[in-house]
């Protein structure tokens, strides 16, 4: 359960100043699935007589799209998504928090994705494709969707989902074929989508086609011409694999159309979408493949250092995540252009944006890529406020929420304060630490800008 804004009040009361009236309401209890969540009336902002914006309390629920009910192995952008929006609106909730909508790869985590820009093909609603005449009921019944309807079987899903999506693509491509199948006439909104997203879509579709051709191996294991992005080799591959490349564009097109419909429905109901992005990209990703100078590279063009966390009382060896580290000096030279693109794209998908591992923008743990543990790492300085100033100059005021959990240096807390981004509180953390952690985690004494979780 997510609470945003001012702390809860124990009694319903009215506060009045010279111009404005603010009403606070108690939360009541609403039983959902297993256990209880707290539901209350949402009031967003008001003005005091001094003219300052006063952030009011609002609340919502964290529900990953993958956890929505459905008959085809995983939650998606279908009927259940709209019904969940209806539930939130009826319960007085104004925020639906979801996990990143990025494609999942090995490990099935949206925080280790093959693309920082693409959407998860698993979330495309198959029943919508059936209504569009791209699939039949027999197509859906022919596949296995897992034995347990309450759990996602990603191994089964990987086989069945893409098999069905390829059938839908074949039907769509056939529908778009011109006379004798020599020319394809795609819908106007498809052309608009590919044009609006060409800065990442072309590379992503080519990358995925190459992964399929290489039996889904990490790109660092591809033959040198493809690994090193030889222009002639890539052009020849693209010409020979036009249909496969088109499939990956088609899936992203359908993902975008369906998700934007869900988001528009939520916004009409007064519900904002709170999404998220990880700070780092995956080593096995199109971003790493095309990024080049965006990352710390050695003389051979391989990643010089990778991300992780230092040893602590949870792990004597620390955490070796393996994500490539950004070359922040290069990003600065470009005016943080890649980050501007990334955040602009994310804000086209979400209304509010949670950035994971916020502390990494202040200081981050850098580990030699050859290390087998995180012990050999060292702290390095991140871009700090320079990055957020560049983002705000390009995009305006940023609706960002910072994931600032865990032990933080004073400099991290200063960066959070300077950015004015809301941080996070988790009520459960109050019961596992010392007195200071207890006080920091209590949601009823939260600072007005905190987002609190129970």
Question: What does each of the following model-derived ranges do?
Answer:
Residues 272-337, 342-345, 364-371, 375-379:
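Substrate-binding/active-site clefts of carbohydrate-active enzymes
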Residues 56-292:
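Acidic/aromatic-lined carbohydrate-recognition and catalytic surfaces
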Residues 111-135, 288-313, 377-387, 421-433:
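Acidic, His- and aromatic-enriched active-site or binding-groove loops in soluble protein domains
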Residues 255-265, 335-421:
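Active-site neighborhood of glycoside hydrolase catalytic domains
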Residues 441-454:
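Residue-level detector of conserved catalytic or cofactor/ligand-binding positions
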Residues 282-294, 407-426, 438:
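Substrate-binding cleft/loops of secretory-pathway carbohydrate-active enzymes
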Residues 33-37, 44-55:
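Short, Lys/Arg-enriched N-terminal segments with co-localized hydrophobic residues
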